[in-house]
Amino acid sequence: MSCNHKNGASEKVLTGNIVDVLAKDIYPGEVTIKDGKITSIKRIDGEFDTYIMPGFVDAHIHIESTLMPPENYARMAVENGVVAAICDPHEITNVLGIEGIDYMIDNSKKARFHFNFMLPSCVPSTNHETAGATIDAQQTAQLITRDDIIGLAEMMNAPGVIYEDADVMAKRFTQASKRFSTSSQSPKLILTAEVKGPRLSFLSFPM
């Protein structure tokens, strides 16, 4: 990949094999960047050994498992082509509660990286452990409205969904009624939700 400057340092032109993930095509091309934004992409003649492609998005990660704070994780991730991440900080939240969420979000702002944080849905993870914190449905309803939280993270409590635990149902109602996204980690379980007036009914289908 080559890089040339035009019209001063504010405009760059990159040449290489462009990976078009939407058209499922790879072709020699030229990408023009001005003031940090792509202004044009076009085909050109030539042969290149390098590739130009969108950055990867890590769709689900617990950064705590890397034993690094977000800013350090970002440095390592970018070197491997990852430019954004959807984060579920439930490990640190089970120890420190809301303080842990705030730490992860505040630290992530130190990095030039697209961090997106979801709100842990199972704190504690199960009813059979001694955790450092608890986040119930009422707290969930308050936290999920924050601008720096994009939705409710993985619902790991499959029994709580199947047997309609009141706290679990309230948490899922909160995210659905506010049109936030949610993720699930319930093996062999399909969850569907149907809004009926002011209430939300959940149907669980074990497979």
State each model region's role.
Residues 50-73:
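Di-metal (Zn2+ and/or Mg2+/Mn2+) metal-binding site signature of metallo-dependent hydrolases
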Residues 10-11, 29, 53-55, 186:
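The start of beta-strands in P-loop NTPase/AAA+ ATPase cores
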Residues 74-179:
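Divalent-metal coordination cores built from histidine and acidic residues
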Residues 61-63, 88-89, 117-121, 154-156, ...:
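A cross-domain feature marking catalytic cores of carbohydrate-active enzymes
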Residues 44-49, 200-201:
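Active-site regions of enzymes building and remodeling cell-envelope glycoconjugates
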Residues 169-207:
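Functional cores that coordinate and move charged inorganic groups
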Residues 69-70, 98, 164-165, 190-199:
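Histidine/acidic-residue-rich catalytic or RNA/ligand-binding cores of hydrolases
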Residues 1-46:
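N-terminal metal-binding scaffold of metallo-dependent hydrolase/deaminase domains
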